[in-house]
Amino acid sequence: MKRKAGTVCTALGIALLLAALSLFGYNEWQSARAGQAASAALEEIAHLWATPETADSAMAPDVMPAVEVDGQTYVGTLSFPTLNLELPVMAGWDYDKLQSAPCRYSGSLATADLVIAGHNYTRHFGRLDTLQPGDEVIFTTMNGLQHHYTVALVETLAATDLADMTAGEYPLSLFTCNYSGQARVTVRCEASDDL
């Protein structure tokens, strides 16, 4: 009887290990696919930068200049020099778009309350929690203007704490879910004096 229980436990352990490895493999595949999609969009964006003449200066404060690439609308790029990472940023967000690139969640540059959401893929926002206060973050608009920020705070918020996420106390906030999905890793950035 003990031998049979041991065999069942061993088989169950192997099955759980295989399930975990399968999940890890699937997540890595998704991360690689997302990284490729972001790289392809960055390449296209580099060729499609809107010139200052084509950017509408009479836009509402919450509207940002945008370009369309392969049916998706982008408002800029984010660069993280300390992470050696550059990503395109989509104009609006939904869960499908997050599979390809970080997305503007709310706010804008003009109103100094831009919030960007990204998936926790390694090739997207998966390393946000490694940023340190003082690290540089650069947002480049579709008309080529660079906005420099420094990380002021890295915090963890509850997944349901949308009021704090969008409170507008920082000109740039970036967030992603943690690996359990129960909380949001949030990076708060201040405008940099070193322009």
Language-model segments: what does each one mean?
Residues 4-195:
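Solvent-exposed, non-transmembrane regions of membrane-associated and secreted proteins
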